[in-house]
Swiss-Prot record:
Organism, scientific name: Radianthus crispa (Leathery sea anemone)
Annotated function: Serine protease inhibitor that specifically inhibits trypsin (Ki=73.8-78 nM) and chymotrypsin (Ki=993 nM). In vitro, it shows cytoprotective activity in the oxidative stress agent 6-hydroxydopamine (6-OHDA)-induced neurotoxicity model. In this model, it decreases reactive oxygen species (ROS) level, and increases cell viability in a correlated manner. It is possible that the observed effect is due to the ability of this peptides to act as free-radical scavenger.
Site location (Important for the stabilization when complexed with trypsin): 67
Additional observations: Does not inhibit potassium channels (Kv1.1/KCNA1, Kv1.2/KCNA2, Kv1.3/KCNA3, Kv1.4/KCNA4, Kv1.5/KCNA5, Kv1.6/KCNA6, Shaker, Kv2.1/KCNB1, Kv3.1/KCNC1, Kv4.2/KCND2, Kv4.3/KCND3, hERG/KCNH2) and TRPV1, the capsaicin receptors. Does not inhibit the serine proteases plasmin, thrombin, kallikrein, the cysteine proteinase papain, and the aspartic protease pepsin.
Name assigned to this protein: PI-stichotoxin-Hcr2e
Entry's Gene Ontology cellular component terms: extracellular space; nematocyst
Domain of life of the native organism: Eukaryota
């Protein structure tokens, strides 16, 4: 019984941490980066509450950089 409770507690803590991480990623600014590649991506615009397309240069980005609109919406719940 104690083991089951402990496992449930660990799972809940893990999901809470993952949710917090995802939320903070969505608040990061759009970073195009200094490189000159041309990668169409999406970022979550926290001011509009929407996933917005942008061109990523290929280096020095952050977590708010999604390959698809679906991925952006799934993580940031837009």
């Amino acid at each position: 019984m104690k083991g089951t409770f402990l496992i449930c507690l660990i799972l809940i803590a893990g999901f809470s941490f993952k949710s917090t991480q995802a939320g903070s990623i969505c608040l990061e600014p759009k970073v195009v980066g200094p490189c000159t590649a041309y990668f169409p991506r999406f970022y979550f615009d926290s001011e509009t509450g929407k996933c917005t397309p942008f061109i990523y240069g290929g280096c020095e980005g952050n977590g708010n950089n999604f390959e698809t609109l679906h991925a952006c919406r799934a993580i940031c719940r837009a």
